[in-house]
A protein has these predicted regions:
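Catalytic-site microenvironment of enzymes
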Residues: 2-14, 18-358
Length: 358
């Protein structure tokens, strides 16, 4: 027993001598520390974001190792590299995939939703005092939110102008606003059908019927305009959809008089436009959604114009960060009675099902 205590005393004395015999001495010591930054991803995965090493030095170049001394044991600490290895072995490290706009946004409660000024691109809006309304199915919801945007229907919208593109570049195609312009009408009044019915009235009726069809299939529905008028310009409507919905569908009828059929407004095949954000990150999703809608309409007996696509530089597309389409469901002379609108709603809903793989 005495021999054991004697050996321990000698060992402790040796440790103190190695450390300089004085805790206040810094001339012959080197402090080494390591920190591993670990955070949780949105999917709940543990992600190692970095290893930080710091060495605070002594005046000498002698490398020393800190040791912990207890009454009965002496333990040598590992080096920085060994510590890092141990952390890596003990921690499950998994790279997360970059977030895409196809992912569902955070679910919001049903009710009115206005434009949040902190949202991306919200500052470009000029008319934004109105509210959209979010509806949810009573049961069997699928968690997907579709923004149904009844085109037009904003009093005073044609008296205001907004920037065509977030980066200030001019339009590349002509429509309501000509190519080369840098500002566009905030919300146009729309056309009038051959029977005297305003387009805004028909788009709202279409939106209400589509809402019911989508709710019956388990979708949440964000009614961008839930009445005859909403004080939200095209940018405000788009930004609200960006932050609440999984996809954005604007309902329109064209101003021609040939009853030419349905088509979607495709993203212009112009390099400068397709390389501009947020178009660059989303135009393929816009096109895929447009094609799905046309296929759904066609399979339900709706007449399709040409190949179902017409290129157009739209404010909606220029500011959209979710799959987004302006769908033209006919023109001034097209049937817009209740039965026809129901048929159109089924075709659109089938296209939405197809796009989301349902």
């Amino acid at each position: 027993m005495r021999l054991k205590f004697f050996c321990q005393a000698m060992l402790i004395a040796g440790v103190l001598a190695a450390c300089g015999g004085n805790n206040s001495s810094t001339d012959n010591t080197a402090e080494t520390s390591s920190a591993v930054s670990v955070e949780s991803s949105a999917e709940g995965n543990v992600v190692q974001t970095g290893v930080v090493r710091k060495v605070s030095g002594s005046k000498s170049s002698t490398e020393s190792t800190s040791k912990a001394v207890s009454e009965t044991t002496v333990t040598t600490t590992t080096t920085v590299e060994e510590t890092t290895t141990a952390v890596e072995e003990m921690t499950t490290v998994k790279e997360t995939q970059p977030e895409t706009n196809a992912q569902k946004p955070e679910a919001k409660e049903a009710g009115e939703i206005g434009l949040d000024p902190s949202w991306q691109y919200a500052s470009f809006s000029k008319i934004n005092s109105g509210k959209s309304v979010l509806y949810k199915p009573s049961e069997n919801g699928n968690g997907i939110t579709i923004a149904v945007n009844a085109g037009h229907g904003t009093k005073g919208g044609s008296s205001q102008k907004t920037q065509c593109h977030p980066d200030g570049t001019p339009k590349v195609t002509s429509g309501t606003t000509k190519a080369g312009a840098t500002t566009a009408i905030a919300v146009s009044e729309g056309m009038t059908f051959a029977d005297g019915t305003p387009e805004s009235t028909v788009t709202f009726e279409m939106a209400k019927i589509l809402k019911e069809e989508l709710l019956s299939r388990g979708y949440n529905v964000l009614m961008i305009r839930d009445g005859s008028d909403v004080q939200l310009d095209n940018i405000a409507r788009t930004v609200i959809a960006n932050n609440v919905a999984s996809a954005h569908i604007a309902l329109h009828w064209d101003s021609t008089t040939a009853d030419k059929g349905a088509f979607y407004m495709g993203v212009p095949e112009v390099d400068s436009y397709r390389s501009m954000e947020p178009v660059a990150s989303n135009w393929k999703k816009h096109e895929a959604l447009g094609k799905s809608l046309i296929n759904g309409l066609s399979s339900n007996g709706t007449k399709i114009f040409s190949k179902g696509r017409m290129e157009m530089d739209l404010t909606q597309t220029s500011y959209s960060t979710v799959p987004s389409i302006d769908i033209e469901l006919g023109d001034k002379t097209s049937d817009h009675g209740n039965d026809e609108l129901k048929k159109l709603s089924k075709g659109l809903a089938d296209g939405i099902d197809s796009y989301f793989g349902r």
